[in-house]
């Protein structure tokens, strides 16, 4: 009986589906015949059956009974709503002409709000701009698979991305000019960099789903800061929507790098590491021992594959108090695992020779775990003639990584043997940027406007217990093609006859940049007739930057210099006993504090007409840089200072011969200031080569 009832129910469902009727149709203007896109068609007797017309004005109604008469309700903005009775047994297609709903009004008040998120708005912004720029809208960003700003920038013409050693895009190169020749803004305000060496900002730490649009300026006007020969990247973050809006996104995936050829994902025990150097924890007179250094970074393990990647974001916003007050809060998280490999060759010049030669071959494997989070919140208050905006942003990234390198010195390769160094580097680097700013715009008269901004921002980088350890191997080979000397590090033909620990280093470095800045601009419009106007603008800015940089390094030798390891596996790094060769840390010129004061003032005028636009301006900037090294060094001054003025003219011409064409010509003068890392007289062995600062370095 039970089977019979189930079969009967299924048969009834199938019969109903077969008997369902489909009605096609089109909706057009009864005078012009133009298709009316988005017309709503509902069935009065069946409220659940509804549809809208497509781009060609056609529609299809599904799930109608096979017999009977029904009333269609057809509605479209500015047209009269119609009710049409249709006998579905006699009609398969229906053409519906719509009549305009004309009414005579005594007064019409039109209010508008520009939607900056759309592609159309981006095109209009580029078209109307007085200087050369590109804009990517939020609509394009949402449709793309890009998860951070660096990936989005790759889609802009004239922009290429510089990738870090692990292969990820990080810095923008605008118009072919190096990353140091551009700067980054958030909502039109410059922010500091967490980088320990330079002013430029790694753009891969900013989640793309927090952005409203991305603006890339390829020429400067006088009201823009002058240290950008290449251009400016402005990240305009999400604004409060015109009505309640809740958006969320989530994605999961995995890197196929670790699935190919059986590659392993490498990790170290970063939960057990030394948070502070002994120098900072116990003072400059403290003699460090091995008990002060935890062994977690040395405990390297391999896994067949990492956990899946996860990316998610959410934003919520609304307007209150008769749309005067807007609020939006958004957050993002990106938890990703990635890997890559690359070859790096060191070069030298032989004594008395003019040619370089490769002195060392290295094949490097990277396993990286990135955790990026971002939060932003914005409030805006709009009153007649006035607008206040308070914006807050915090982005944070933690990158844990293992770099495993096999290196071969070409100078000491024997006929059947050579030395191979296996180096392990374990890192856990944290970067963060916090910015808060208050902006005001005041239309005091119809033609006179004042806008101002006050900003506090801070960028930090912490890189504690960066660990390097090297094993040295004596390798024998049958010298056949395809062995390590020929380029294949993992050749099955080689035999490791001896492995012993060589040396180790542990570095502790961190830096902090703190900025206070203020801006003010005054704008006055003058009209000449009906088709020409002049926009006069003047203003100034002041920024105070404070930077602290700390760097401590400890060198280690194996406790047993005659120790020979059983093999060169990854686990061997955690079993070696070391002794500290530099228990008081190495004195470094990279322990310094610095200050920078930048003031600027400008004046410019923009002439607009139907033929185009001319912008002419002049900017003056004063720079004062001071650094103080915390330690004394022979033949070196402990304090250094630079102070100078720069005068920067600019001109932008836009000719509009037709409504669909702009011809642009730009001229501007800019500067490039050295970073503190470059003018402090330090000298260290960097990742790839020896680095040295130059206190006499001038701006360009």
Where are the language model's segments positioned?
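Transmembrane beta-barrel wall of Gram-negative outer-membrane proteins
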Residues: 296-404, 431-436, 649-651
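Short acidic/polar hinge/loop motifs at secondary-structure boundaries
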Residues: 62, 161, 189-218, 264-268
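Short, acidic Ser/Thr/Gly-rich low-complexity loop/linker segments typical of extracellular
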Residues: 47-58
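Structural signature of Gram-negative outer-membrane beta-barrels, strongest in the C-terminal barrel
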Residues: 430-439, 443-447, 455-457, 509-521, ...
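A beta-strand signature from Gram-negative outer-membrane beta-barrel systems
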Residues: 96, 193, 205-249
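Short loop/turn motifs that connect adjacent beta-strands in outer-membrane beta-barrel proteins
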Residues: 102, 240-245, 320-325, 384-385, ...
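Extracytoplasmic beta-strand/coil segments of soluble accessory domains associated
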Residues: 62, 150-190, 231-234
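Short, acidic, small-residue-rich periplasmic hinge/interaction motif at the N-terminus
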Residues: 28-32, 39-44, 73-79, 89-142, ...
């Amino acid at each position: 009986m039970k089977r019979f009832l189930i079969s009967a129910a299924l048969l009834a469902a199938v019969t109903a589906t077969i008997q369902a009727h489909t009605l096609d149709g089109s909706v057009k203007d009864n005078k012009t015949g133009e298709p009316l896109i988005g017309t709503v068609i509902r069935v009065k007797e069946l409220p659940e059956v509804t549809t809208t017309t497509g781009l060609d004005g056609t529609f299809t109604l599904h799930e109608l009974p096979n017999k009977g008469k029904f009333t269609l309700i057809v509605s479209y903005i500015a047209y009269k709503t119609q009710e049409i009775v249709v006998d579905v047994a006699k009609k398969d297609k229906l053409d519906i002409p719509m009549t305009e709903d004309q009414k005579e009004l005594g007064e019409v008040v039109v209010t508008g709000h520009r939607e900056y998120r759309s592609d159309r708005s981006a095109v209009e912004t580029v078209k109307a701009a007085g200087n050369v720029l590109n804009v990517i809208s939020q609509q394009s960003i949402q449709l793309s698979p890009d998860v951070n700003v660096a990936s989005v920038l790759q889609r802009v013409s004239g922009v290429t991305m510089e990738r870090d050693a692990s292969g990820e895009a990080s810095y923008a190169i605008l118009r072919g000019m190096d990353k140091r020749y551009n700067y980054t803004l958030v909502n039109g305000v410059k922010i500091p960099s967490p980088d320990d060496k330079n002013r430029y900002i790694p753009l891969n730490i900013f989640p793309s789903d927090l952005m409203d649009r991305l603006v890339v300026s390829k020429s400067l006007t006088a009201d823009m800061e002058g240290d950008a020969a290449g251009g400016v990247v402005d990240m305009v973050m999400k604004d409060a929507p015109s009505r309640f809006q809740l958006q969320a996104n989530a994605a999961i995936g995995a890197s196929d790098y670790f699935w190919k050829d059986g590659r392993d994902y490498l990790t170290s025990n970063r939960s057990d590491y030394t948070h502070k150097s002994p120098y900072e924890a116990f003072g400059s007179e403290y003699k460090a021992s091995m008990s002060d250094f935890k062994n977690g970074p040395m405990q390297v393990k391999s896994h067949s594959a990492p956990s899946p990647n996860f990316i998610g974001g959410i934003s919520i916003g609304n307007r209150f108090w008769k749309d005067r007050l807007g609020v939006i809060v958004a957050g993002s998280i990106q938890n990703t695992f990635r890997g890559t490999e690359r070859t790096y060759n060191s070069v030298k010049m032989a004594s008395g020779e003019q040619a370089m030669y490769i002195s060392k071959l290295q094949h490097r494997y990277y396993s990286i775990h990135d955790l990026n989070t971002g939060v932003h919140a914005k409030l805006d208050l709009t009153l007649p003639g006035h607008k206040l905006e308070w914006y807050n942003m915090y982005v944070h990234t933690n990158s844990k990584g293992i770099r495993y390198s096999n290196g071969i010195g070409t100078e000491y390769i024997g006929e059947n043997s050579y030395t191979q160094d296996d180096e392990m580097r374990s890192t856990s680097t944290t970067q963060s940027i916090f910015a808060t700013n208050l902006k005001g715009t005041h239309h005091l008269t119809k033609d006179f406007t004042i806008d101002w901004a006050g900003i506090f921002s801070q960028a930090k980088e912490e890189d504690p217990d960066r660990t390097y350890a090297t094993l040295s191997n004596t390798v024998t080979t049958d010298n056949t093609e395809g062995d390590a000397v020929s380029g294949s590090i993992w050749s099955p033909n080689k035999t490791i006859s001896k492995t012993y620990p060589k040396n180790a280093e542990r570095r502790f470095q961190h830096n902090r940049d703190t900025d206070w800045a203020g801006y003010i601009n005054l704008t006055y419009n003058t009209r000449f007739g009906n088709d020409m106007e002049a926009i006069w603008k003047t203003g100034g800015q002041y920024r105070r930057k404070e930077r602290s940089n700390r760097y401590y390094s400890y060198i280690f030798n194996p406790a047993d210099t005659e120790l020979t390891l059983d093999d060169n596996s990854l686990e061997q790094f955690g079993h070696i006993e070391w002794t500290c060769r530099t228990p008081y840390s190495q004195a470094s010129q990279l322990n310094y504090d610095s200050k920078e004061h930048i003031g600027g003032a400008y004046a410019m005028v923009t002439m607009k007409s139907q033929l185009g636009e001319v912008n002419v301006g002049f900017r003056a900037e004063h720079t004062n840089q001071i650094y103080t090294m915390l330690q004394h060094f022979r033949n070196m001054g402990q304090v250094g200072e630079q102070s100078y003025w720069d005068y920067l003219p600019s001109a932008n011409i836009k000719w509009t011969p037709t409504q669909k064409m702009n011809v642009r010509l730009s001229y501007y003068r800019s500067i490039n200031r050295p970073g503190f890392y470059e003018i402090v007289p330090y000298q260290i062995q960097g990742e790839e080569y020896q680095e040295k600062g130059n206190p006499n370095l001038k701006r360009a």
